[in-house]
Every structure is written in C-alpha cells, then in structure tokens.
Amino acid sequence: ITTLEGMQGKLDTAAAKCVSNYGFFIGATEDNVEDLQDAVGTRENPIAIPGICGIKIFMGVSTGTLLVSDKTALEKIFTETAGLIAVHAEDEDRMNERRKLVEGRTDVAAHAYYRDDITALLATKLSVELAHKTGHRLHILHLTSGIEADFLNDHCNLPSKTEGHPIITTEVLPQHLTFD
C-alpha cells in the first residue's frame, strides 16, 4: 500500500478484525514522496498517525511497484520524510548482474546465490550512508549475513547512545541465524 487512503483502508480493516495490537508500514516507490509525506510528514512537520509505523523501502526487486533502487530517489525519501524508514536491503544492480548466473536453476540454493551477502551489504551500506547524511531513523529489516552484522556493529546504537548520530537498528529472522 503506497497511499494514505490505502493505509486508512487497511487500518480500518485491522480495527474491525484484530484482537491484538497492530501497525503497518506505507510502501515507498520511486515517485510517491508526497504520499509518504501525507502518512508520516516531513522533517519540519512530522505526523504521527496511530497504526502507521513508518516507511518501508524494498531496495531490490519485490512485488508490483514496491522498488526503490535509484540513489536519487532514495535520497529524496530520506531527505523529505519524517519517522522511521525500514529497508529490505538488496542491491538491485548486483541482483540484475547475478540473475543470469542462476537462469534455469530451480534448486533452493539458487536464491541465496543470486541474492548473496555482497548484494545485501551494498544496499545496507547505502542505507546507512543516507541515514548518516540526513539524520534519518533507519531500521535494516531481516539482516541476512555476518558481513552485514560486522558492518552494522559500528553503526547500530541504543537510542540513549546516539547523540549526534541517527538511530540505526536491525533484526534477524531465525532462518538467517547461520552467520559465519
């Protein structure tokens, strides 16, 4: 969902059906900064709408229009919006280069080969660079590699220890707990 109207529909459905707490991210595209601002505001005028957690960016290919791989578009989102930005960190250019290496493969290992550690690290580094440049709050979704963890070790801090630096956090899914 990439518009405030769509988000409101999802929030209304959740309010009618959910028995637990909930929250949703509005999806970023390369050309919906104004929609993002409607949902989370700008740096100068942040908005807090209950149930909207922040902005989610897919830096590598996803579903529909949910892809923001252009650095200029990413920088615009980081610069012109408020709140939390959560990223699925995968470098689209590297994935496009590697796609031919797995063409015709259907084995489960093809996915990990195609979307390798470097693919994740490149996008993670770019996200962190933009967070530092803009002071934007950043969360790296679903950390997948030890090299990303090593890189982020110098960039992730508890909110109480971030004076002068943006808050950058991450998390990991159980299936990725096979770091080297």
Spans of features found by a protein language model:
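Active-site mouth loops of central-metabolism enzymes
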Residues: 1, 20-34, 110-118
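Metal-associated gating/positioning segment near the N- to mid-region
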Residues: 1-17
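Generic hydrophobic/packing signal
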Residues: 14, 18, 26, 40-43, ...
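Histidine/acidic residue-rich metal-binding segments in metalloenzymes
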Residues: 34-180
